Amino acid sequence: MGRFELGDRYRVKDGRVFNRTCEVNVVEHCNLRCRSCAHLSPVLPKHFVDPEALCSDLTVLARSYHANVLKILGGEPLLHPGLPEIMMAARKSRVADKLEIWTNGLLLPRMERRVWEVVDSVRISLYPGRSLTQDKLDTCVDLARQNNVSIRYKHYQAFQESYSEQGTEDPELVQRIYTTCNSAHRWRCHTVANGWFFKCAQSYMIPKGMSLGPQATYRNGIQIDDSPDFRDRLLSYLTSPEPLPSCRNCLGSAGRYIEHQQVRRQEFRPVQSRPTEDLIHPRLVGTTRLALAKAESLIPRAAVDTAEHVMKSSDPLIGLLRKAQAFNTSLFRG
């Protein structure tokens, strides 16, 4: 696991904060219903981001912030009927050097050529029983090569418990979960939504999925504006050691591992209706680098990542990793 410390310095150059990635959820619903989806997509209504509004928000943000890669995701981003316009809006804003689509791939063979011509890379998440056939994967690889687009995929056999409906009243536990959260501090999954900037997608999605209302949602972020002090306020927000309000219900990187499964919409929230303490693995929560190093040895290899091509499912490496996943996943059920 990569090392991080709260307050690690961000690179600031020419008046802008730099980060590896930034994310935009162009839709919030999905064509799959994965249990414990970190974005709570199974219970969120249909919502399509407006390309013009997105361009405006990202253009203003770009004056104070820049990312190497802007991730276009959801939900399932390919459900957006105006995806070509979304991609052009993102490119026009110049908030990032490259554009990357994250998808479950089910709609990828039908993705418009205009999108292939604009996107730089595509990342596919494959789930047991709900994945593209090898023939369709091969078709997607051919389309990517024709348009000089990088394409990778991951097989997910396990998910982590992502949030708790009940949450916790233990401020020390909330702090520990926040301190060891990969999304906030290691991967820095910065998210732009409705003119607001969030430290991670979960801080925006959890209050929405739990129907807590706009006030509970937006107090986790910072509103994007063109004021002279916005960059400094953004930097202060990003490096704050204080947990966000949504961290009370979020499990960060500490959730127990569970076998991936699809659930009905009405089942999604009830299965999360347990206290935080029941849904985390104690050994995945800590405040020291040593604790993080120990946690790495517990995490099952829940995905297989390729380089610039699609690895065939018959590859013996995948079989070995799946056996390891099955063994490691069993450790997290106790």
Question: What are the language-model segments listed below?
Answer:
Residues H80-K208:
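Conserved AdoMet/S-adenosylmethionine-binding subsite of the radical SAM
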Residues D50-D57, Q261-S273:
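Short cysteine/histidine-rich metal-coordination sites, predominantly Zn2+-binding motifs
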Residues M1-S41, R219-D226, T239, P243, ...:
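N-terminal pre-core extensions flanking Radical SAM catalytic domains
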Residues C30, C34-C37, C181, C189, ...:
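Disulfide-bonded cysteines in secreted/extracellular proteins and peptides
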Residues Y10-R11, Q175-Y178, L234-Y237:
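Short, P/G- and charge-enriched loop/turn segments at secondary-structure junctions
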Residues M1-I101, L106-R110, E277-G286:
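Conserved alpha-helical substructure of the radical SAM core
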